[in-house]
């Protein structure tokens, strides 16, 4: 909005003249004040209106300025209206208002302030007594009018600010968010898994070392009545916590002297001197045992197995006869039909592994005909015997007995997995029930393992091959026979012959339970 330039002539309207006088008089005093402060000078204004009413302004004291004025006799600059008009004509303004003159309001807006012109000076005595010297201008508040339009704008701004604060205000009553963490540790609950003893837990080594899981209700899998849990071989594997390869432990009640637990060590066996916090809740009679596989894991695995995927299987057996299922057999297949499921097994008779600090199993492996368990070895197991484990006095006779008569009530198969990968546990819901004969076939099973003596004679191997060999995948006719009157912490493995190794057919695992 530009300035309205007016002709500098006498205002004929008395009302407008009074308004203009009030406005410009104050402007003149304001300019005098600014000049006195900025330029450090003394100013005195003496104004008589048309009614001969006096208005004066002095930067300090009017009497002092007037005294100095009367005593001053030197030549000085003195101007009148004619001098100012002449100067304005030279600048080409032709008597119009100078653009430097500030106009606060239009003259007609001050018509209502005619009667209040004298009230301004009475309200603010600083204009007369020169007390307001620290501010820019002694402008009284009465010269500013709050119009209804301006007041409406202020109210609108306040409402918008309040709405913004309410929209961004965080409610203090909101509960703190919690994020559930999924754990791949299925815990067998007796109410949901009837084929497992209370407290049987499958724990990966790195997870068991980081947390102790004690509440079985919080870790129970969904209530799908499964009887066994099967490890899916095609899933990625958990990184190892021991610096070697990832080892999955099926932890159970292991009677170790001095209350020490077990934990995986670098050689793939179970260390009895480790901290007991490395194992979860225990229950049952299972002894962890690590065995190499014939099919090595992917690159990045352990030093022996370095080319193929491992084949894993996990079975959680009952802890007593009362927990056995009805007289039928369950058949669990892998979640990937094309992936073979075989238990990687390390022979405890391998001469390349140091026997110190190891827990030997009572199970004769595929090559234990050259390295049988002696009485000294059996005496080492006296501290580990429990009511659920095979009595050690019967081990020798049991080794001579047919393997088909030995049942697996507690079985742990722990695979030597590759480094830097995850180990996942799946519960397979494909359960096929099939009747089985009372006794297993005897043509393929011998007391020396799951391979006949003829295979040992026609396929001789060095003793060091026990680290790189493993039990192959089970085909449709192979199976493991389980009896409910025998409890032993053993892991069985069967090296496959050349026909099974070269067979292109789809391999699968069968775990059958039969009762005599």
Curated annotation (Swiss-Prot):
* Chief subcellular location: nucleus
Subunit and partners: Interacts with hdac9 and nlk2.
Give the gene name: mef2a
Q: Where is this region: Interaction with hdac9?
A: 1-100
Which source organism does the UniProt entry give? Xenopus laevis (African clawed frog)
Location of the protein in the cell: Nucleus
* DNA-binding residue intervals: 58-86
User: Where is the PTM Phosphoserine found along the chain?
Assistant: 386
Q: Where in the sequence does UniProt note compositional bias of the Low complexity kind?
A: 465-475
UniProt feature, compositional bias: Polar residues: 327-339, 420-433
Would you tell me the protein name for this molecule? Myocyte-specific enhancer factor 2A homolog
Q: Which GO terms describe its cellular component?
A: nucleus
């Amino acid at each position: 909005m530009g300035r309205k330039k007016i002709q500098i002539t006498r205002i004929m309207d008395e009302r407008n003249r009074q308004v203009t006088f009030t406005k410009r008089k104050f402007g003149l005093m304001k300019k005098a004040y600014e000049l006195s402060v900025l330029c450090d000078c003394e100013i005195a204004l003496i104004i008589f209106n048309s009614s001969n009413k006096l208005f004066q302004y002095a930067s300090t004291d009017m009497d002092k300025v007037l005294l100095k004025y009367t005593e001053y006799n030197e030549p000085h600059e003195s101007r009148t209206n004619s001098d100012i008009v002449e100067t304005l004509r030279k600048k080409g303004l032709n008597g119009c208002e100078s653009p430097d003159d500030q106009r606060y309001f239009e003259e007609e807006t001050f018509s209502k302030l005619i009667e209040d012109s004298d009230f301004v000076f009475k309200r603010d005595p600083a204009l007369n007594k020169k007390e307001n010297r620290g501010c820019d201008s002694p402008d009284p508040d009465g010269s500013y009018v709050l119009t209804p339009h301006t007041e409406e704008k202020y109210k609108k701004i306040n409402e918008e600010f309040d709405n913004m604060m309410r929209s961004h205000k965080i409610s203090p009553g909101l509960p703190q968010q919690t994020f559930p963490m999924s754990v791949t540790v299925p815990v067998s609950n007796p109410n949901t898994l009837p084929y497992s003893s209370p407290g049987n837990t499958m724990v990966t080594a790195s997870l068991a070392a980081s947390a102790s899981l004690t509440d079985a209700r919080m870790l129970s899998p969904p209530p799908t009545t499964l009887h066994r849990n099967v490890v899916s071989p095609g899933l990625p594997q958990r990184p190892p916590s021991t610096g070697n390869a990832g080892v999955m432990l099926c932890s159970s009640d292991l009677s170790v002297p001095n209350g020490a637990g077990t934990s995986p060590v670098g050689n793939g066996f179970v260390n009895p001197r480790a901290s007991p916090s490395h194992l979860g809740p225990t229950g049952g009679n299972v002894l962890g045992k690590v065995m190499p596989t014939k099919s090595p894991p992917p690159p990045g695995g352990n030093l022996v197995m370095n080319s193929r995927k491992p084949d894993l299987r996990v079975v959680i057996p009952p802890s007593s006869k009362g927990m056995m299922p009805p007289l039928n057999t369950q058949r669990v297949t892998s979640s990937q039909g094309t992936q073979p499921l075989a238990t990687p097994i390390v022979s405890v008779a391998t001469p390349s592994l140091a026997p110190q600090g190891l827990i030997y199993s009572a199970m004769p492996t595929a090559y234990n005909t050259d390295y049988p368990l002696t009485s000294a070895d059996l005496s080492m197991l006296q501290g580990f015997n429990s009511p659920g484990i095979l009595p050690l006095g019967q081990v020798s006779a049991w080794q001579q007995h047919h393997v088909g008569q030995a049942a697996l009530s507690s079985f742990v198969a722990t695979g030597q997995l590759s480094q830097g990968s995850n180990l996942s546990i799946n519960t397979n819901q494909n359960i096929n029930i099939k009747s089985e004969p009372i006794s297993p076939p005897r043509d393929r099973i011998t007391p020396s393992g799951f391979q006949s003596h003829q295979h040992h004679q026609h396929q001789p191997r060095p003793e060091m091959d026990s680290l790189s060999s493993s039990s192959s995948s089970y085909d449709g006719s192979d199976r493991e026979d389980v009896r409910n009157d025998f409890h032993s912490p053993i892991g069985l493995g069967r090296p496959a012959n050349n026909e099974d190794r070269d067979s292109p057919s789809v391999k699968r695992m069968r775990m059958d339970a039969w009762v005599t």
